[in-house]
Amino acid sequence: MKIERAYTIVTAPGRNFVTLKIVTDEGTYGIGDATLNGREMAVVAYLEEHVIPALIGRDPQRIEDIWHYLYRGAYWRRGPVTMSAIGAVDMALWDIKAKVAGMPLYQLLGGKSRERVMVYGHATGKDIEACLDEVARHVEEGYRAVRVQAGVPGIASIYGVAKKPGERYEPADAELPAEHVWNTAKYLNHAPKLFAAVRERFGDDLHVLHDVHHRLTPIEAARLGKEVEPFNLFWLEDCVPAENQESFGLIRQHTTTPLAVGEVFNSLYDAKALIENQWIDYIRAPLTHAGGITHVRRLADLAGLYHVRTGFHGPTDLSPVCLGAAIHFDTWVPNFGIQEYMPHEAVTDEVFPHDYRFEDGHFLVGETPGHGVDIDEEKARKYPYRRASLPVNRLEDGTLWHW
């Protein structure tokens, strides 16, 4: 069996997605998600110019060798563009291998470690009361875990808060980056009030998560983590910029609130010190951006040695292809923690038919050979790419800040 051709499919059913399709000389094909939010076409160019030509004629079942060929052989290693391209190839090759074996992907990985995969949903609101209403809706739909994000008085735009009740939050909503204004003091004063209100209304059984989105300094994050301990958060996510790994050691010294990080990571080496020093509790690197199943398996294995669990990034800017593969991975991985879930728009699901199911706050993995997600290329052609950029943040004095 040889790789006969490979090509990218760029489509925007609800938002932009990049899909890599690899076809063998025997007619079996696999698909992988190559979407990098706001930088989609950079990955397309990397795949088309540097990766696809090197794949033709190779044995698609030699997944490990191809991974190292693309990683080591490129010399210019790591980075989100390179690793998203490798991740897409790897995902597609595992899809092919599982189809050839006639097995769902999780069986090739080692079989089930659990019967279902717990997910967390996103509850947002312009104020605390509106956020509580969204939490209630999620609870009614069966969610056992909910991320809460609410508007802050005096700040016009808050990360994670949808523009209207019931809408999906989509930050990449302008052709060029919108500029938001941030005030740390107002946020720190308001956030604990949100968690107190959630606990007062919903009690202690609901898993409550929150995303700071890299906005704080280490000592500010330590203060917040300490202050919210009475509310027993499932995790506090991305409380400081992820580049400063040692800062998590400082935060850990001050609080027992569980810490999660990693959605911007694209390599095992980004997380190595965090895991080995036990500065975090959950690693969030997604399959697409972190080099695919082959590399994330190594990351999860390392994490498991130090009692760090997975909590993969899973917003709507990763396509159902990545989500489907992640559900298979979650079903297998021993040190699973939780899976992020933002439902895609109906039109997205039409373009990407899949066999995974959401039920009672959990995903149930499908039994279709492969990762269980396909792409309808005819429908995909109806939704052309449109440039969309993530925002930037400034402090009130104009200083550029972390978004």
Curated annotation (Swiss-Prot):
Entries under InterPro entries matching the protein: D-mannonate_dehydratase-like, D-mannonate_dehydratase_GalD, DgoD-like, Enolase-like_C_sf, Enolase-like_N, Enolase_C-like, Mandel_Rmase/mucon_lact_enz_CS, Mandelate_racemase_C
Family statement: Belongs to the mandelate racemase/muconate lactonizing enzyme family. GalD subfamily.
Documented EC number(s): 4.2.1.-, 4.2.1.39, 4.2.1.8
Keywords: Lyase, Magnesium, Metal-binding
Annotated site residues (Important for activity and substrate specificity) in this chain: 315
Molecular-function GO terms, alphabetical: gluconate dehydratase activity; magnesium ion binding; mannonate dehydratase activity
Binding site residues for substrate: 37, 122, 263, 284, 313, 317, 340
Cofactor mode of binding and number, as noted: Binds 1 Mg(2+) ion per subunit.
Source taxon at top rank: Bacteria
Record-listed Mg(2+) binding positions: 211, 237, 263
Cofactor names: Mg(2+)
PANTHER family (UniProt xref): D-GALACTONATE DEHYDRATASE-RELATED, STARVATION-SENSING PROTEIN RSPA
Function: Has low dehydratase activity with D-mannonate and D-gluconate, suggesting that these are not physiological substrates and that it has no significant role in the in vivo degradation of these compounds. Has no detectable activity with a panel of 70 other acid sugars (in vitro).
Organism the protein comes from: Halomonas elongata (strain ATCC 33173 / DSM 2581 / NBRC 15536 / NCIMB 2198 / 1H9)
Record has Metal-binding as a keyword: yes
GO terms of biological process kind: amino acid catabolic process; carbohydrate catabolic process
Protein name from the UniProt record: D-galactonate dehydratase family member RspA
Catalytic residues (UniProt): 159 (proton donor/acceptor), 213 (proton donor/acceptor)
Catalysed reactions, semicolon-separated: D-mannonate = 2-dehydro-3-deoxy-D-gluconate + H2O; D-gluconate = 2-dehydro-3-deoxy-D-gluconate + H2O
